[in-house]
């Protein structure tokens, strides 16, 4: 990274950057993409912004943070869930870079006092990308954060996400059920959307009517009707869902269950012969049941409608080029022994040029799948205490997030340290 260097000489960097490298589909007045290359006499700012986006894509970043400080401007990329400082343009470019990004995202360039949100559609190295742009006024100007939505990353299949064979089979059966609710749960950025889209792909869209309600529609999928919510004009999740139910749907994907009205409508849909897939923000699978009851649903309805809950996290994958086995500490050996895992050696990433000296490259999912059977339906109907319910699920063979992660660490897919970092001891 450039974190140790002084302000860089732009002309050196920009020598190799062409205006056409990032082709922005500007939507000014019309939907016709405007090729930036055609706009002659480009200023260094335009080229530098192109350079930032290009570098981020090249390094596999999911987000770009442009952060003005008193005497410097920091550009950080989020790679595999971690932020890395990537470049330090001159502090004086802060306003110009923010303005350029606002123009690209069709935002109000003169408004610097309130946050703004927009989106940039562009092509980088032949790849079509969507950048979600968010600006925020702060002490030294405006901070700009961009989320890179790469349509390729969402085209992964279920069996590429890191599921164990058994979990994968059970989950596929869940999403092929003709009716009921199937949930994916986890914090923001844990890969829920990717799992939902991959799950929709195993359903036969030629024979079934599949519809989604999302906020916003992140990726467009062929053969599926996708609807975006607009809270400001009253197009809420609940309202969109009610409208969808009049469209003779078979499968409905809801971006998120946020409130009682949406939850209630989703349950009614599930109980009247529709399959509903959605997400929640809970730490583990069993606590999703409690969350639905807390939203205001009757426990017996939750028990009747719920088919399965998949809790997930993303963990960093060990770099294939520098991973190796080493002897665990005494304390770690004891811990591994208690978990019933091999304790003579453990996998670690040494760090090399290929992985920015982190020891990790790429990510995979760890999962906890709760499949609801008749016995559990009866338990849920009695509104169990959450820790008691969790204990019961584990006793009946549910693999916890941490157990799934430790299994993957013992196979050398990730490290034990990474699993302990991402999961809480209770899960």
Can you annotate each of these PLM segments?
Residues 143-144, 265, 363-368:
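Cytosolic catalytic headpiece of P-type ATPases
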Residues 282-373:
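Cys/His-rich Zn2+-binding cysteine-cluster or related metal-binding knuckle/ribbon modules and their
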């Amino acid at each position: 990274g450039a974190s140790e260097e002084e302000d860089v000489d732009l002309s050196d960097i920009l020598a190799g950057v062409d205006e056409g490298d990032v082709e922005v589909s500007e939507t000014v007045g019309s939907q016709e993409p405007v090729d930036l290359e055609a706009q002659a006499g480009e200023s260094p700012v335009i080229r530098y912004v192109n350079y930032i986006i290009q570098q981020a894509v090249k390094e596999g970043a999911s987000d770009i943070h442009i952060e003005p400080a008193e005497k410097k401007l920091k550009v950080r990329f989020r790679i595999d869930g971690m932020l890395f400082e990537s470049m330090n343009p001159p502090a004086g470019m802060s306003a110009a870079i923010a303005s350029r990004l606002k123009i690209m995202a069709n935002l109000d360039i003169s408004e610097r006092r309130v946050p703004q949100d927009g989106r940039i559609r562009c092509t980088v190295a032949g790849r079509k990308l969507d950048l979600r742009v968010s600006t925020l006024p702060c002490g030294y100007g405006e901070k700009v954060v961009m989320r890179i939505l790469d349509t390729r990353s969402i085209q992964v299949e279920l069996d590429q996400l890191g599921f164990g064979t058994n979990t994968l089979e059970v989950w596929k059966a869940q999403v092929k059920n003709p009716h009921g609710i199937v949930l994916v749960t986890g914090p923001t950025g844990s890969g829920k959307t990717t799992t939902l889209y991959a799950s929709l792909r195993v359903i036969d869209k030629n024979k079934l009517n599949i519809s989604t309600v999302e906020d916003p529609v992140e990726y467009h999928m062929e053969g599926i009707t996708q609807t975006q919510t607009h809270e400001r004009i009253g197009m809420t999740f609940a309202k969109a869902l009610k409208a969808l139910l009049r469209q003779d749907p078979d499968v409905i994907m809801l971006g998120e269950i946020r409130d009682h009205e949406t939850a209630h409508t989703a349950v009614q849909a599930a109980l009247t012969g529709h399959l509903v897939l959605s997400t929640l923000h809970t730490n583990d699978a069993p606590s999703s049941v409690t969350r639905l009851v807390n939203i205001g649903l009757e426990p017996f309805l939750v028990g009747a409608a719920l088919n399965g809950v998949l809790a997930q996290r993303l963990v960093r994958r060990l770099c294939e080029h520098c991973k190796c086995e080493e002897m665990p500490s005494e304390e770690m050996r004891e811990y591994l022994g208690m978990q019933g895992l091999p304790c003579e050696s453990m996998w670690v990433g040494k760090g090399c040029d290929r992985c920015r000296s982190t020891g990790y490259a790429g990510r995979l999912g760890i999962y906890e799948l709760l499949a609801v059977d008749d016995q559990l339906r009866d338990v849920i109907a009695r509104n169990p205490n959450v820790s008691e319910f969790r204990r019961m699920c584990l006793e009946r063979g549910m693999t916890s997030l941490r157990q799934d992660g430790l299994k993957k660490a013992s196979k050398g897919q990730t490290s034990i340290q990474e699993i302990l970092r991402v999961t809480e001891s209770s899960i």
